[in-house]
Every structure is written in C-alpha cells, then in structure tokens.
Amino acid sequence: MGAGEFPTTPPPHRYYAILAVLAQRQGIDKVAHTFLLQPGRWVLQGSWLERDGLPINVKGMTLVAWNRDNWFTMATKLIFPGSDRADIALQYKGRLDIGARQYTFLLQHNILGQVEGEGWIGLDTIVQRYWVLSDRERRSGFETLHRVNDDSYYLTSGIMAGHYLTSTMEASLERQRTN
C-alpha cells in the first residue's frame, strides 16, 4: 500500500474495536429494560396452547421487587377465564449483580414444583430457561421477553417434557404506573 492509500477493510480486531466505540457513543451498549431490572407491577394478557388443544385466554399479573443486595423477587399469577384450567402461581427469587447480563433464579411453581433457572439480558430481549428439580418427566421451559417500549413487552414461553413441547404461551405485558 502506497502513501495516502487506505485499506478497503480494517483488520478484524480493529473492526470490532471500532464497532464497540460506536456502540458506546450511540448508547446501544446500555441495557434499557424496565421489566425485571426495575421494581414494578405488570399486567399480562394473551393465549395459552396445550398439545392437541385449542388456544385459551390467559390473564395475569406480575410483581417485581428488589432489595439492596442485588436480589430480586418476582411473583406471577396466571388465570384462565372461561376455562376449567387451574390457575398457575409462580414465585421467583434470583440474583443479578450490577452490570451483569446473566443471572440465576429459584422458582416455586404450584404445578411443576421446585425449579432452577438462568436468564440472559440482551439489548431488547430477556431470555430465561429453567428445569424442574427431581422430575421423572424431565420437564423444562423457556421464556423470551421482547421489549416493545418502556411500558410494554411481548412474552413467548414454552414448557417441555423431555424433548416435546407440552404447552406454549404468548402474551403482552403492560406496566402499571403507580401514582
């Protein structure tokens, strides 16, 4: 390369360093989530689908609280209006260190029992996976929460037994503002 000429593409290590600096300047390296990362009350509405069944309405509420030691609690209650499906109650307790993007949690589920899980916090999505402890059916599940805006998320989730889906849920979550 002669004097005054520029390379057509920077070396790979320089390329990633440049992208990181640009991301910082544009603020896209910062997490903008309000669900889970801030205390609050969220209303859920959507549909629940079980294997070989028709979708049914699901409604619910989630409360998120934090203490000073980076521990969070989350309580969710799901109801199925107009259906004989039993309500679902979930009690989470987890820890997320300041600046971290990964966390672990314990969950008490009124149908599945004791559950352990982990979560990852992306730029626009929170993904959780969990597994039921001491379970002969090898049940596990996942949740993906996609941020629509500060007050709204879209949730998709599924529960599996072994390698097979047994149920899925898709719902919107809307933050309830307190006065």
Regions found by a protein language model. Give the residues of each.
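Amphipathic/hydrophobic helical signal segments and adjacent flexible N-terminal regions
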Residues: 2-87, 165-179
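Central antiparallel beta-sheet cores of small beta-barrel/beta-sandwich binding domains
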Residues: 44, 49-141
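Glycine-rich, aromatic-bearing surface loops/beta-hairpins
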Residues: 131-179
